[in-house]
Amino acid sequence: MKVRMICMILLISSISVLSACGSKEKNVEKNDTDVLPLNDSVPGWLESFYNSDYEYRKSTFVLENDIEDTIAVVEGKVEASPYKEYVKIVEPAESSWSEVWFYGDGDDVTAILNIENDYVLQNTRRFYPYGYGSNLSLSKDRTEEYNGIPCDVYTAEYTVNLTGQINQKSGEAIITEPITAVVSQEYYVDPEQDQLLCMITDASDRQEKTEIANRVMNDNITVEEAQKLVSVDEVTKEKMEILSYDDSISIDIPEI
């Protein structure tokens, strides 16, 4: 259960952005904020997703011994421009906060958390959906039905430079050895509407490599030594379902 709680806190976007706040130890946030400009190879349905207002549900689940267990669910909505986002926790009920609002320009944004009906203001980094800004090489893998809709399923994978991200955020070379992780994705696209309906991300390798990075930083050991201590047998995935695209979405930021 301890490993699963760590996965839950660190892998869901909003939780991952906020989880390290107030922590005394150095821990890697498992968010995906190493952002590059969109390039000409990005398909229309993906670029449209990045620039649309929409509602979504994210579920983080683990697969172990052929048993799938959903460990966290959040629901949210996004206003693309100017950026606003609202997230509420559906599961687990014992979370320290129940809902959060994000707003701001660029990568540095403001978050307002509802903690037991008391608002807390924090500065944080904007979280982007997995794959944003990466040089994705998408390929059509198959056709599969999703919620009764025949979808084209595209696959992609990209490499995350964890060493570079950690050192950039800290402003110094905390880790001197390379640590990289491969993130694999599946995109379910409605070809009739040319819309992204669902994105499934396998973050298992990133989960393991992040645990290795945390060991290197907190235990002052080498990457090779940390690899011997870390063993992640679970497959960790995040499923992001687009519930609706809606230009009329309006997010009211609480006044505090």
Regions found by a protein language model. Name each.
Residues I9-V17:
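Bacterial N-terminal signal peptides
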Residues P150-I256:
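Gly/Pro-enriched, hydrophobic low-complexity segments
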Residues M1-C7:
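Bacterial N-terminal signal peptides that target proteins for export
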Residues N51-R57, S81-K88, N147-T155, G171-E172, ...:
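Short, hydrophobic/aromatic-rich segments at coil-to-beta transitions
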